[in-house]
């Protein structure tokens, strides 16, 4: 039994490795992780959003860029990656640890990291030499500005409970948009090495 389990694990690792045949396909696992992260964010709710209405802010989520036809396939992958990386960075901070139930926060950060790890399998193959120029690509810059606005807001509000609640709701929107982008990539073929 242990041998069969070891063999199955080895097959999975080979299949998802850099040279593996499944390496650059968006998997169901990525979508399941995305859904689980949304559920965790929902469970992290500590305050009624209605009690924080005075702290609401429009962060300018670039939703139309992601959900519309503005992104080409070669832009969609780096935008998805950047959204997940910035989400992870937002929640993997000392300020965030003080604001949330640490068990749920750890689970969320782990889930975001799993999504990033899955995408890392493809990142070098998809982006390769283009990586430095993609960092300056308009959609990436837009995503970075969006998250910088969130960081600035939290700092301006002194990382208050209401500020974090507003950001939690906003991040649910952002991760929903990133899930939509994952679905679009899958419809584009899912094979991130194809043109």
Swiss-Prot record:
Q: What is its main location?
A: secreted
Q: In which domain of life is the source organism classified? A: Eukaryota
Localization: Secreted
Gene3D superfamilies with a match to the protein in the record: 1.20.1250.10
Query: Which cysteine-cysteine pairs are annotated as disulfide bonds in the entry?
Result: 24-122, 52-162
Would the keyword Calcium turn up in this protein's UniProt record? no
Q: So which tissues is this one expressed in?
A: Constitutively and exclusively expressed in the mononuclear cells of the extraembryonic trophectoderm.
Q: What does this protein do?
A: Paracrine hormone primarily responsible for maternal recognition of pregnancy. Interacts with endometrial receptors, probably type I interferon receptors, and blocks estrogen receptor expression, preventing the estrogen-induced increase in oxytocin receptor expression in the endometrium. This results in the suppression of the pulsatile endometrial release of the luteolytic hormone prostaglandin F2-alpha, hindering the regression of the corpus luteum (luteolysis) and therefore a return to ovarian cyclicity.
Organism encoding this protein: Ovis aries
Other information: IFN-tau genes are intronless. They evolved from IFN-omega genes in the ruminantia suborder and have continued to duplicate independently in different lineages of the ruminantia. They code for proteins very similar in sequence but with different biological potency and pattern of expression.
Identification of the protein by name:
Interferon tau-4
The family line of this record is: Belongs to the alpha/beta interferon family. IFN-alphaII subfamily.
Which UniProt keyword terms apply here? Antiviral defense, Cytokine, Disulfide bond, Hormone, Pregnancy, Secreted, Signal
Q: What's one GO-annotated cellular component? A: extracellular space
* Gene Ontology biological process terms, A to Z: defense response to virus; female pregnancy
Q: What GO MF annotations does this protein's record show? A: cytokine activity; cytokine receptor binding; hormone activity
Which segment of the chain is annotated as a signal peptide? 1-23
Q: Which SMART domains match?
A: IFabd (SM00076)
């Amino acid at each position: 039994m242990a041998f069969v389990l070891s063999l199955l694990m080895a097959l999975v690792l080979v299949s998802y490795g850099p040279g593996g045949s499944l390496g650059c396909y968006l998997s169901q696992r990525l979508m399941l992780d995305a859904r689980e992260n949304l559920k965790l964010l929902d469970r992290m709710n500590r305050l009624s959003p209605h009690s924080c209405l005075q702290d609401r802010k429009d962060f300018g989520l670039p939703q139309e860029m992601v959900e519309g036809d503005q992104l080409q396939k070669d832009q969609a992958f780096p935008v998805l990656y950047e959204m997940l990386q910035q989400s992870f960075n937002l929640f993997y901070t000392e300020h965030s640890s003080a604001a949330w139930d640490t068990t749920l926060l750890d689970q969320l950060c782990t889930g975001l990291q799993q999504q990033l790890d899955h995408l890392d399998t493809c990142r070098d193959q998809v982006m390769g030499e283009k990586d430095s120029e993609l960092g300056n690509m308009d959609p990436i810059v837009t995503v970075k500005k969006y998250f910088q606005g969130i960081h600035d807001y939290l700092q301006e509000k002194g990382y208050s409970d209401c500020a974090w609640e507003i950001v939690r709701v906003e991040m649910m929107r952002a991760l929903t948009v990133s899930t939509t982008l994952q679905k679009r990539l899958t419809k584009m073929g899912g094979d991130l090495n194809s043109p």
